[in-house]
Curated annotation (Swiss-Prot):
Protease as UniProt keyword: no
Keywords: 4Fe-4S, ATP-binding, Chlorophyll biosynthesis, Chloroplast, Iron, Iron-sulfur, Magnesium, Metal-binding, Nucleotide-binding, Oxidoreductase, Photosynthesis, Plastid
HAMAP family with a match to the protein in the record: ChlL_BchL
Disulphide bridges: none
Keyword Nucleus: no
Coiled coil ranges: none
Localization per Swiss-Prot or TrEMBL: Plastid, Chloroplast
Reported cofactor(s): [4Fe-4S] cluster
Organism of provenance: Pinus thunbergii (Japanese black pine)
Catalytic activity, EC: 1.3.7.7
Cofactor binding note of this UniProt entry: Binds 1 [4Fe-4S] cluster per dimer.
Record-given protein name: Light-independent protochlorophyllide reductase iron-sulfur ATP-binding protein
GO cellular component assignments: chloroplast
Length: 291
């Protein structure tokens, strides 16, 4: 099974992806996580360091695939999760989609692409072009990470459009949304009411999740010396269980941009009728920052 994880930049995709990967491994799956971001920090909390990228390795070998061994590009992370970082083209040049394609090509050359029960693609930011959407060409399911803010849901809606487009030619389905770092879900509920899709899980604001990223550890590793965090791991184990159940998934129909803006703005301007929130919370409601 191949899963592509998308969401607004900075929403917590990599931290969530790493914890889901470990949760899947805890359920007995052989897991490979592929980071698809030029920052090549997707697997940082699994390995504790920035591993060499596929592109760096290919360049060092002058793109001679026959000179590359699996251990050159596949690194062992916490919990037995294997890790790969695709890397990216130089800033302002090249295409991220090409890099993803080269990564998959190399893994196939190494007979590694089909050796895993689960391959999880952790993909940068919003989908703004076909290059960023390239991992969807290989995925069975897409999982969208969001929060209860306007910007994150707007990005989720754009990703939804890409899923629908790719599903025309690939057996791709949306597994659902995962809410991250949110104490409320009124905007999420409003969105899925207008654009029906499953909500896999909603994680509350938990400071230890952010701290784990800085420490370069997954929550599962931190539980070893902080047993009180076990309840956080249960969120990720629940997500893993839903993925392993091979949900039917859906091909979603995105909401037109102006309609989505109007939908969420109505909740913002009419908080009592739209969700019962006080007007003095409006910055957080829309995900904007007061300057």
């Amino acid at each position: 099974m191949k899963i592509a994880v998308y969401g607004k930049g900075g929403i917590g995709k990599s931290t969530t992806s790493c914890n889901i990967s470990v949760a899947l491994a805890r359920r007995g799956q052989k897991v490979l996580q592929i980071g698809c971001d030029p920052k090549h920090d997707s697997t940082f909390t699994l390995t504790g360091f920035l591993i060499p990228t596929i592109i760096d390795t290919l360049q060092s070998k002058d793109y001679h695939y026959e000179d590359i061994w699996p251990e050159d590009v596949i690194h062992k992370g916490y919990g037995g999760v294997d890790c790969v970082e695709a890397g990216g083209p130089p800033a302002g040049a090249g295409c991220g989609g090409y890099v993803v394609g080269e990564t998959v090509k190399l893994l196939k050359e190494l007979n590694a692409f089909y050796e895993y029960d689960i391959i999880l693609f952790d993909v940068l930011g919003d989908v703004v072009c076909g290059g960023f959407a390239a991992p969807l060409n290989y995925a069975d399911y897409c999982v969208i990470i969001t929060d209860n803010g306007f910007d994150a849901l707007f990005a989720a809606n754009r990703i939804t459009a890409s899923i629908r487009e790719k599903a025309r030619t690939h057996p791709l389905r949306l597994a659902g949304l995962v809410g991250n770092r949110t104490s409320r879900r009124d905007l999420i509920n409003k969105y899925v009411e207008a654009c029906p899709m499953p909500v896999i899980e909603v994680l509350p604001i938990i400071e230890d999740i952010r701290v784990s990223r800085v420490k370069g550890k997954t929550l599962f590793e931190m539980v070893g010396f902080e047993p009180s965090l076990n309840y956080v791991c249960n969120y990720y184990l629940g997500i893993a269980d839903q993925i392993l159940s091979q949900p039917e998934g859906i091909v979603p129909k995105e909401i037109p941009d102006r309609e989505l803006f109007s939908l969420l703005s109505d909740l913002y301007l009419n908080p009592i009728g739209g969700g019962g929130q006080k007007k003095n919370n409006k910055e957080n409601l829309l995900g904007f920052t007061r300057i």
